[in-house]
A protein has these predicted regions:
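Conserved catalytic core of the tyrosine transesterase superfamily
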Residues: 1-180
Length: 180
């Protein structure tokens, strides 16, 4: 019995991963699917432009740890991607390799090697603090003489005094309040 060529196995796996696994099993949104497809496409572009790999020559060796690390450096230096973008693209590739290893055990080495690749350090974002003066101006701008104004004042007061997120406040129901 003739075995299926490695490039064909990988091509079929990419197709199944993107058309069945991600949308049906993982239930990813349309935008997430687009992002995953772009991420995988960028890795394939890298293989073609930097390594001379074509759709007929793609193989397990194309997912070697050193090539993936080289790709991450390429993303940062050539494509000018931020650390967050590089980490996102790396997680997409790792996700595919995990899928591929589950489908065909012969690729498990590449999944294990990719799992060892560390994420790039991301700079901590500074939290923008609202000044007391700004808070006072927000409260002063609410017209508390109207019913809607009273509602808005109560909402802002609850948000400010508890530090609760708006979606948590909006999901509150009367039955959840205990005013005793």
């Amino acid at each position: 019995m003739k075995t299926k060529a490695e490039h064909s196995i990988i091509a079929d796996a990419i197709h199944e991963w993107h058309t069945v696994y991600l949308p049906c099993i993982r239930n990813l949104s349309h935008n997430a699917l687009k992002s995953y497809g772009e991420g995988m496409g960028i890795y394939i572009d890298f293989l073609e432009s930097s390594k001379g790999v074509t759709s007929n020559t793609i193989c397990g060796e194309c997912f070697r740890k050193d090539w993936i690390e080289e790709w991450i450096a390429w993303l940062k230096e050539v494509r000018k991607c931020s650390p967050q973008t590089c980490n996102h693209r790396l997680s997409i590739l790792k996700n595919f390799l995990r899928f591929l290893a589950h489908k065909k055990i012969q690729f498990i080495k590449y999944d294990c090697d990719a799992a060892e690749i560390k994420r790039m350090q991301q700079p901590k974002k500074q939290v923008e603090v609202i000044t007391k003066d700004t808070i006072k101006r927000i409260f002063a701008s609410i017209n508390t003489r109207t019913l809607i104004g009273k509602r808005d004042f109560a909402l802002f007061n609850l948000l400010y005094s508890t530090g609760t997120r708006i979606d948590e406040i909006l999901s509150l129901r009367l039955s959840a309040l205990h005013l005793d």
